[in-house]
Amino acid sequence: MAPNLRKSHPLLKMINNSLIDLPTPSNISAWWNFGSLLGICLATQILTGLLLAAHYTADTTLAFSSVAHTCRNVQHGWLIRNLHANGASFFFICIYLHIGRGLYYGSYLYKETWNTGVILLLTLMATAFVGYVLPWGQMSFWGATVITNLFSAVPYIGQTLVEWAWGGFSVDNPTLTRFFTLHFLLPFMIMGLTLIHLTFLHESGSNNPLGIVSNCDKIPFHPYFSLKDILGFMLMLLPLMTLALFSPNLLGDPENFTPANPLVTPPHIKPEWYFLFAYAILRSIPNKLGGVLALAASVLILFLAPLLHKSKQCTMTFRPFSQLLFWTLTANLLILTWVGSQPVEHPFIIIGQLASLTYFTILLILFPIIGALENKMLNY
């Protein structure tokens, strides 16, 4: 009998072991769809991004006009740009849900997979930030100015660091050029990191909603989960296309329709919606260095998740108190997102500070305590 090419060819064998004959737990729910959705997001973003880069000019005098030209004169340029801008939002929706799934079901106990995932999140955030600067509108310019300025909070070398990042004494042409370079480069880095992420995942195999070893009951990835993933793609592409075609500017900032002007500061500088929770945490501390440290900690805290797991059970499926805490954390993040979009005025300042405190308290203190408490309850 002739050998099956799919199983013997060096390249096809790798694809086969990752996407076709991969043993997969039979009970994984729709929450396990987001990994493949993130893959689709990345592919879409790279494709639309390459097409946009072909028409973009990384120069302060031409950047804004080149984006307008793409939307007006390039075949379907408006659609490509709208898909790219809103695709970023869907990328973040998927990654936040993916991380939420990981926290809920204890996937962080697969340490290598989890840590590469957090590095992926950081790289994605960097990519989105530098990408937002490229259209060179008012919010692009002032967002870049405010966020890069945070490096000046680093003791001793801060100011040097900022000027080195800017390539001058303010955000200007060199800054735009290097941001374009980074925005082009980082997605390919994300691709590489994704392969590492998947390599680590396939070492241990997938987690499942029960959090128990499922080796005795695994099924091939294809056709079961390949079909389920295609359903997921459809359900994501539908709202993405709806947003891109019906209200493409819904999630953007109207300030970005005005070309960048260093002499006029927008009344309220704020990042895109997916960074608002971190921005709220940054603003809630009245000290610059303290704010920067809190901002960094708000994301880097994910690295600590495996160390803070005190429960005897992997998932939260049978842990009602941890579940309550998890959904409180979710609500808290939504409050932070809302506060980040509001001006720095009386009620919002204190709400932001309380929400920031709650965020760190839940993750660092309450989760381990409740986990240990639930272990005690197992004895009764």
Curated annotation (Swiss-Prot):
Heme b b562 binds at H84, H183. InterPro entries: Cyt_b/b6_C, Cyt_b/b6_C_sf, Cyt_b/b6_N, Cytb/b6-like_sf, Cytochrome_b, Cytochrome_b_C_euk/bac, Cytochrome_b_N_euk/bac, Di-haem_cyt_TM. Binds 2 heme b groups non-covalently. A ubiquinone binds at H202. GO terms for cellular component: mitochondrial inner membrane; respiratory chain complex III. It is a multi-pass membrane protein. Its cofactor is heme b. Pfam families: Cytochrom_B_C, Cytochrome_B. GO terms for molecular function: metal ion binding; ubiquinol-cytochrome-c reductase activity. Heme b b566 binds at H98, H197. It comes from the Eukaryota. The keyword Membrane applies. One of its GO terms (biological process) is mitochondrial electron transport, ubiquinol to cytochrome c. It is found in: Mitochondrion inner membrane. Belongs to the cytochrome b family. The cytochrome bc1 complex contains 11 subunits: 3 respiratory subunits (MT-CYB, CYC1 and UQCRFS1), 2 core proteins (UQCRC1 and UQCRC2) and 6 low-molecular weight proteins (UQCRH/QCR6, UQCRB/QCR7, UQCRQ/QCR8, UQCR10/QCR9, UQCR11/QCR10 and a cleavage product of UQCRFS1). This cytochrome bc1 complex then forms a dimer. Component of the ubiquinol-cytochrome c reductase complex (complex III or cytochrome b-c1 complex) that is part of the mitochondrial respiratory chain. The b-c1 complex mediates electron transfer from ubiquinol to cytochrome c. Contributes to the generation of a proton gradient across the mitochondrial membrane that is then used for ATP synthesis. This is Cytochrome b. The gene is MT-CYB.
